Amino acid sequence: MRIKQSEFIISAVKPHQYPIDHRNEVAFVGRSNVGKSSLINSLTNRKKLAKVSGTPGKTRLINFFLINNDFYLVDLPGYGYAKVSKSEKDTWGKTIETYLSHREELKRIVCLVDSRHKPTGDDIMMYEWAKHFGYDVVVVATKSDKLKNAEFKKSEKLIRETLNLTKDDKLYFYSSLNKKGTEELIDKLFLEFATDID
């Protein structure tokens, strides 16, 4: 499929602010600075659709983007940034938890991890939480352009072991810089929710 149209719809904190048109939703979640906004912009081929912040942890809202007038891509606040207060972290955590635990329209969670590093405790907790509640979960390892060819297998092994992924669990490597495999990744993440698959 091709993403022909992508549109920012609303930023939300509370459930009453979420869209009410019952379209399917695919949520992106990951720690601050994992490259979530860059990935969204790359997949949609829109340089400024999701704001890329130079300050980790600045995105505090749930952002809903309508894709091909068909389904929502949902950008969740980044977690794990050390330089914010505990109360702010708690607030972000509750915002994410409220959305993930009560959203019938949510069909898939895309967990982002940094391909260069071992997944953090927060990454593990988020992945296990998503699996526990029965969501279809896809792991995308970002910034793969930073890896040498010989490092891919080592990185994949480390991520799979740390997150306790099975052979059937989905893990994809992606670079927003070189965009290799963009079409394949779009299909893997969104195709089953699309009505226009051209």
UniProtKB/Swiss-Prot annotation:
Gene Ontology biological-process annotations: division septum assembly
Signal peptide residues on this chain, from the entry's feature table: none
Keyword Metal-binding: yes
UniProt keyword list: Cell cycle, Cell division, GTP-binding, Magnesium, Metal-binding, Nucleotide-binding, Septation
InterPro entries referenced in this protein's UniProt entry, alphabetically: G_ENGB_dom, GTP-bd, GTP-bd_ribosome_bio_YsxC, P-loop_NTPase
Binding site for GTP: 30-37, 57-61, 75-78, 142-145, 174-176
Cofactor or coenzyme needed: Mg(2+)
GO molecular function ontology, one term from the record: metal ion binding
Highest taxon, organism lineage: Bacteria
Residues covered by the EngB-type G domain: 22-195
Record's keyword annotation contains Magnesium: yes
GO cellular component term, pick one: cytosol
UniProt: Mg(2+) binding residues: 37, 59
Function in brief: Necessary for normal cell division and for the maintenance of normal septation.
Similarity section: Belongs to the TRAFAC class TrmE-Era-EngA-EngB-Septin-like GTPase superfamily. EngB GTPase family.
NCBIfam families to which the protein is assigned, alphabetical: GTPase_YsxC
Protein name: Probable GTP-binding protein EngB
